[in-house]
């Protein structure tokens, strides 16, 4: 039996955890689930901890609390904060223990091995606290696998008691290891794997669809240009999108916008207003899981060439090549929080996005309406043959002007024509097969 097929053993159960803290953790869970071998028994374990959801929204939306939280994410304040927050999370683990025990009770065949995949640190700490107790009670072997969902070495992601922690980069691995050593914490295995992007979107486009993507990013073709605009779970950035769409529509009437948004009270007004905009297709649901599914469906049923998004876990869609279903040009709004800046840093280190100096130079050209010389364009694009995304300037009007300037100056067209799959995938960290690697590694632990 091959390592991955060990997971299909009837006595093995895979449990995916889910926390109500934005859509990012669920997107990663969805990606991992999509790459499982057929025949694996799975269960989704959700948390009803409203505190996690409330804290996430409060910090994401309010500027003062966001800045305070960022202060706690660096240096000595981070170390102190992590110490107390970890204790807090582990002290409220009774509900998690009860839910895992219920999973055992609900199985017809009592599992002997249970793989629990945690994509949120809060749930990971709670599970780690009760893991040995449940093993003793059930006689089963529990393997706790933690997947870090941003390339951020925040200390709270170090989970004593986990069997393995997967991180997107060597940098994050080394910083977490150093923190654990200096803090005298229980040793946990940390491994670097490519970020687990959804394998369904790594499928190659047909030659017809790839040509369509090329036409969409090219100037003067008259093609309908499809944008995907996912609204974050905490609904950050709605005002930006609300103003960006008409700004773009005023420049070209054949832009088409696919907006993915959860239906909650604080998105109602946004949805009511953008519904009246021309060429806007709304994809909404009241349920997180449906929102994640509909996002994937948009890419599967359309040739999406641009995505305007936050540099959250969505930043790692840059691991798709342009000839893949999910390989749209990524256009990032202003980063919010340390983890989003860390994700942008990951992209810069690997040449998937321009550095700040070149980015600001391009912004300046767009602001002044200057044409980009052929020599400069060729030089930039030839040197940066792994380029996948751009950071947008602050403000919806400047962002719209920049996107239009890039189209008129054939920047996007040139970027794709000079793109090299080999260059973009030259480093292990930037490959799109992270899900396959994940399950191969997990199989060896079972």
Which residue stretches match the model-derived regions?
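Nucleotide-activated sugar donor-binding and catalytic core shared by glycosyltransferases
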Residues: 1-446
